[in-house]
Amino acid sequence: MARKIPLHRVRNIGIAAHIDAGKTTTTERILFYTGVSHKIGEVHEGAATMDWMEQEQERGITITSAATTCHWNHPKTNEQLQVNIIDTPGHVDFTIEVERSMRVLDGAVAVFCSVGGVQPQSETVWRQANKYGVPRIIYVNKMDRTGANFFNVEAQVRDRLKANPVPIQVPIGAEENFRGMVDLIKMKAYTYNLDAQAGEMYKIEDIPADLEDVVAEYREKLIEAAAESSEELMEKYLEGTELTEDEIVAGLKKRCLAMEITPMVCGTSFKNKGVQPLLDAVAMYLPAPTEVADIKGETQDGDAIIVPSTDKGEVAALAFKIMTDPFVGQLTFTRVYRGVLESGTYVLNSTKMKKERIGRLLKMHANSREEIKELYAGEIGAVVGLKDTITGDTLASEKDPVILERMDFPDPVISVAVEPKTKADQEKMGIALGKLAEEDPSFRVNTDEESGQTIISGMGELHLEILVDRMKREFKVEAEVGAPQVAYRETIRNAVKQEYKYAKQSGGKGQYGHVYLEIKPLPSGSEPNFKFNNEIKGGVVPKEYIPAVEKGCAEAMLGGILAGYPMVDIEVTLYDGSYHDVDSSEMAFKLAASMGFKQGCRSAAAGAVILEPIMKVEIETPEDYMGDVIGDCNKRRGQVQSMDDRAGIKLVTAMIPLSEMFGYSTDLRSMSQGRATYSMIFDAYQEVPRNVSEEIMKKRNG
């Protein structure tokens, strides 16, 4: 079966936003206008088609990024486009989901609330989009809300996100009088009835007289932005010649794809205004797979190569999300970059070098599914029946087992102990946690060796709450949850040299390993957080024992030296040693390295310290409670970074240790009579003050 829609008519986009900016509603409307869903699902009725897990509908937030396919006609050429939408969660505990979806997107729509503007989570999502080089357009939503201000959001995008927004529309009216928008390219007004019903089209009218000045100012900025895309257009602009509509669109698209500008549109998804022009902007300014940089990959030997987006050539696809579906079992969401993925064929998981059979292939529409035979380059779909593939793995042909870029996943910052309520739950809990950990690489499960308890770790309290909740609903496992524990780390402050000789002689074959190590701190937050150098000259330690020395140090780091927390940011250099022809073994060198490493780090000269996760906390509070909020931040060992005004509300940004933030939402509520809100995000690890460090050690070491 040949491809229905050529590659240049495909758009893979994400809709990313801060929680409550109206992202799911916007996606819903897009699906409605593109003819996929017939009844509009409202989030606050808990019926949105994109949010299909029970917990999401209850909490009114989006957790899993479902991938949905819909169609829209290009406003210029009228050709049908295939738009694949990845719905990304806006809550900070789910940034891992956003990272994942950014990885497979070609473009994104950043949704901002016209009242709330740029929030801390928006900054994180924006940084991730920059990191993966994703061009985007901005949609300012909720223009009908009290306090709506399109131009404020434009200023915040410039100041807080350091971006270059270029409005291609300006709003007509605001708050309850928001009626539509002026298209600055066609220079026409699009107006809607105030109570526009779903699916209602806008009327095209002349620009209202009271907006002429604003329109002229922003039209000028827009033309200048387009003219800067090339020297010819710049010359034309400077000579005072009008640029044609096609030249403006081409200029803006070129600069949008180069991430030099971000086109801005506005609307109110809930009130059905502005969604069709938003889709037109997606079609005109966001890239097809052929217009973005080809993905980088590596061969099995580790050589870097480029994998071009094309149907020709051997298949190369990336698994970016695993989900357990109640009807079909495990779904692996996959983006094909090259070649064709066909159902019923065998491919190689080149990351693990294991063969996999592609069972069924599905295209997902929010919560219905369509079975297909092939998935072509640039397309996104779900594979049923993969056994060994997890997030971030590459599926490729055996003839050309390329590995596409790997994704980096953040380490968890918080953990809790979970105990099954009954014996019967014990086994089920093991299976459930295993499945959840497969789906979500930022969620880890391990067993505490001393207490034998199962410890789960994740990106925040909400993250773990939702996972425990899913365990109860999807796997019917009842579990008791302990108090949250902070993921402390340990490191050293100074470089030390340490010699260690491990020699045992007790009849028969002895053990002998002898190493000289230099142990140095790396800069805070280094990636990777352990570096090993071998500077052995003249074979004083034979080559085959070097990996054992590295392994000994790496394993010693896991157990820490002060309070048993994993160590980070350390570089070890093996620079001398000796061996014994008969008694030396890998085991002996591993033990020598491990004991030498611990001894070196424990020495007073190394200056070992405990590190704790510091959170960037943003609190929005009415002015009356400002004093209490700041006083409380200081009490929690916080450092207030800034205080701003936003639409009559005070905005406090502070750095506060995670260990002081448990139960904060309840305290903040009672402090402000429920009127203040906050959000927090992990910022960095910092050294713990001495008195706190002693308490931690006392608790851990008894």
Swiss-Prot record:
One of its GO terms (cellular component) is cytoplasm. GTP binds at residues 17-24, 87-91, 141-144. Its main location: cytoplasm. Residues 8-290 form the tr-type G domain. It holds the Pfam family GTP_EFTU_D2. InterPro entries: EFG_II, EFG_III, EFG_III/V, EFG_IV, EFG_V, EFG_V-like, EFTu-like_2, G_TR_CS. It comes from the Bacteria. One of its GO terms (molecular function) is GTPase activity. Keywords: Cytoplasm, Elongation factor, GTP-binding, Nucleotide-binding, Protein biosynthesis. CDD domains: EF-G, EFG_III, EFG_mtEFG1_IV, EFG_mtEFG_C, EFG_mtEFG_II. It is found in: Cytoplasm. Catalyzes the GTP-dependent ribosomal translocation step during translation elongation. During this step, the ribosome changes from the pre-translocational (PRE) to the post-translocational (POST) state as the newly formed A-site-bound peptidyl-tRNA and P-site-bound deacylated tRNA move to the P and E sites, respectively. Catalyzes the coordinated movement of the two tRNA molecules, the mRNA and conformational changes in the ribosome. Belongs to the TRAFAC class translation factor GTPase superfamily. Classic translation factor GTPase family. EF-G/EF-2 subfamily. This is Elongation factor G. It comes from Aliarcobacter butzleri (strain RM4018) (Arcobacter butzleri). The lineage of its organism: Bacteria, Pseudomonadati, Campylobacterota, Epsilonproteobacteria, Campylobacterales.
